[in-house]
A protein has these predicted regions:
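Amphipathic hydrophobic-ligand
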Residues: 46, 73-88, 159-175, 197-204, ...
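N-terminal type II signal-anchor transmembrane helix
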Residues: 1-44, 429-434
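Glycine-rich, small/hydroxylated-residue low-complexity segments
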Residues: 49, 88-91, 98-100, 216, ...
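Secondary-structure transition motifs
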Residues: 37, 44, 65-180, 262, ...
Length: 447
């Protein structure tokens, strides 16, 4: 018995060494690399996943490349990772588990699925068919599993859409598991691009993935002096609901080419973005609603203002510096609705109203207010047109219709008619004394 007791530690040591040798041999085998690829493919819901030959140094493994492909229209069509390095716990191998304490990736590229595949995948999901959604690296129920404790990606490039184009490039990611199917994700740096919008630099983003939804706790973006803060959630292949606060956003890139020469300034406000995902009509169903104010605003070469400037001999109308400009809005791909619009150059003019733009055609109803001092240069205007008085302005309604680039108003014609009538009456001695500019306005109308 004593001999057996003395030999037992030796036998255990031999068994441990033999097991270590066996596992080391197995880890270098093609069978293990294939099993690891199958585990990763299952976790990613991919059709295939392959690792380049792996190199081991104690508890650290190195790999040149990892690739995964997916053709069912899910989260990606291809995933390509370069320069992988992982530290793992040997004890997990006894449980058929690859326990990775930390994995680092130098570069990760993710390409979006084709539009047709996305539509087919969405239809299958809505019908209840197909496999249930999994979080990244949730593991297998049988065979080998992957237990990733932390992932650090130095450079991630993710194209999430090709029609319209959109994605993020050059961002650094840190991912930490936070329960079954859940991950805490921190992002830093990189550039966000979306077709039709200026590029934005990402400062930082704090997010949480809980399959199948990405929760954005906070994301800070900038473009020059522009600053945006984004919160909200994105439910995979269903919908995105985001809240955006913006400050100092240059308005010109958001305008049509004709208006970029007429209006300058910076936007401040907030907006809600609702976007369906996973179908070919998603881009046509996007809606944005919110409120905004324009600071440092300047209106230049607006026809109606030029006309008022001509009538009043006031050059300030030709380059109107705005002391206040604000509105509520709802924007969809084929329609813009603006309510509670207020545009004012204090002591000169104030405009209030609502309008819609559909298929490039504007239809709006406004109230235009001018100061009595300004209107004194327009004979008959206060008696016939600007008849209402409040808030330091004399007011009249105005209708604006036609192409957005060259709209038509009904105020100019009324000003012309009223002024002509007043000047003619003055010449005939009916009206009495009128300011000398009346004759100048008559000359303008006749020539």
């Amino acid at each position: 018995m004593g001999v057996v007791l003395l030999a037992l530690p030796v036998l255990l040591l031999v068994a441990v060494v033999a097991a270590r040798i066996y596992f080391e041999h197995y880890l270098h085998s093609e069978a293990f690399r294939k099993s690891l690829g199958e585990a990763a493919a299952k976790s990613l819901n991919a059709d295939s996943a392959t690792f380049a030959p792996l190199e081991f140094d104690g508890g650290t493994v190195f790999g040149e490349n990892f690739q995964a492909t997916r053709g069912d229209g899910g989260a990606f069509s291809s995933l390509d990772a370069d320069q992988l390095r992982a530290s793992f716990d040997w004890h997990g191998l006894l449980r058929h588990t690859v326990q990775i304490d930390e994995m680092s990736v130098q570069r990760l590229n993710i390409e979006p699925p084709a539009a047709a595949a996305v539509e087919a995948h969405t239809a299958q999901s809505l019908s209840g068919a197909g496999p249930a959604a999994q979080g990244p690296l949730d593991g297998l129920k049988k065979g080998w599993t992957v237990d990733l404790r932390k992932a650090v990606i130095s450079e991630a490039n993710w194209q999430w859409s090709d029609k319209p184009g959109g994605g993020i490039t050059g961002t650094a990611l840190t991912l930490i598991p936070n329960g079954p199917g859940a991950w805490i994700i921190d992002a830093q740096g990189g550039t966000v691009a979306l077709a039709g919008w200026p590029e934005l630099d990402l400062d930082t983003a704090s997010m949480r993935w809980q399959s199948p939804t990405l929760f954005i706790n906070s994301a800070g973006l900038r473009n020059g002096a522009s600053r945006l803060t984004v919160t909200g959630e994105i439910e995979t292949r269903k919908a995105a609901n985001l809240q955006v606060k913006f400050d100092g956003v240059d308005i010109r890139p958001l305008l049509t080419p004709d208006w970029r020469e007429r209006l300058t300034g910076r936007l401040t406000g907030q907006a809600n973005v609702d976007a369906p995902l996973g179908n070919g009509n998603a881009a046509r169903q996007l809606t944005v609603s919110g409120s905004m104010a324009l600071t440092e605003g300047v209106l230049t070469a607006l026809p109606i203002l030029d006309e008022i400037g001509t009538f009043t001999h006031t050059e300030r109308f030709r380059r109107l510096e705005l002391t206040k400009a604000s509105a509520d809005f709802t924007k969809s791909p084929d329609r813009l609705e603006v309510h509670n619009l207020v545009v004012e150059s204090e002591g000169l003019i104030r405009v209030e109203g609502d309008y819609t733009v559909v298929n490039g055609q504007i239809d709006g109803n406004f109230e235009v207010g001018l100061t009595p001092a300004t209107l004194q240069w327009i004979p008959g205007s206060q008696e016939v047109i600007f008849t209402d008085s409040h808030g330091g302005y004399r007011w009249t309604p105005m209708r604006l219709t036609g192409p957005v680039a060259h709209p038509h108003d009904d105020l100019t014609s009324r000003l012309v008619a009223a002024t002509e009538k007043a000047v003619i009456k003055s010449v005939d001695g009916v009206e009495g004394t009128v300011k000398k500019t009346g004759q100048g306005l008559l000359d303008l109308l006749m020539h």
